[in-house]
Amino acid sequence: MIELIDVLASDGQPAGIRKPKDAVHRDGDWHRAAHIWIMAPDGRILLQRRSLRKENNPGLWDVSTAGHLSAGESAVEAAVRETFEEIGLAIPAGALEFVTTLRESSVLNGGRYIDNEFHEIFVVRREVDLDALRLDPEEVAEVKWVRDLRPDETFVPHAEEYALLSRLRRPGAQRRA
């Protein structure tokens, strides 16, 4: 089945167009994605290493879970869906703390994959038993908890998001709207 994505204007407003996901990335259309950061009560952060089968950034460490918003889907709906699909964790919508929206643009794979996204950033504060997770091998190679987030060349480049996350990782941290 072809996944359709709502195309946005560069200011984030709906363009009134739906396109297949591969066409969105081929053409460099702006679109939305949900990024879900899972944090343990003690401040540890859950990271995923992207599957080597992924078209973009294979094998790199990344956000706990993430994914495109399907056409007509809300960011909360996408966050709940993607977390379950990628790592088998059911997150109630009420557990998602919306933090902010970040705009990010990258060109990958020799210009064949243009990723112009508005990232809807969420935090979920809860303990997770890694052994109980069911990883989708098409999406996720492995997961791990880290106490100190130190992005380097083994991470998907999300500089602004990592900086924001380092401020939010403290228990009781205030979210930014």
Where are these regions (language model features)?
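Short gly/pro-enriched beta-turn/loop segments at secondary-structure junctions
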Residues: 31, 91-94, 117
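Internal catalytic-core helix/loop-beta-alpha segment
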Residues: 73-109
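Short, well-ordered strand-loop elements centered on a beta-strand within folded domains, enriched
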Residues: 13-19, 43-49, 131-135
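Conserved Nudix-box catalytic region and its N-terminal flanking loop in Nudix hydrolases
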Residues: 23-34, 40-81, 85-86
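Nudix hydrolase/Nudix homology domain
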Residues: 19-22, 59, 71, 98-177
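A residue-level structural signature of the nucleotidyltransferase/glycosyltransferase Rossmann-like core
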Residues: 5, 28, 44-45, 132, ...
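Short, conserved, surface-exposed binding loops centered on an aromatic residue
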Residues: 37-38, 88-90, 112-113
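Acidic, metal-coordinating catalytic segment for phosphate/diphosphate chemistry
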Residues: 1-35, 39-41
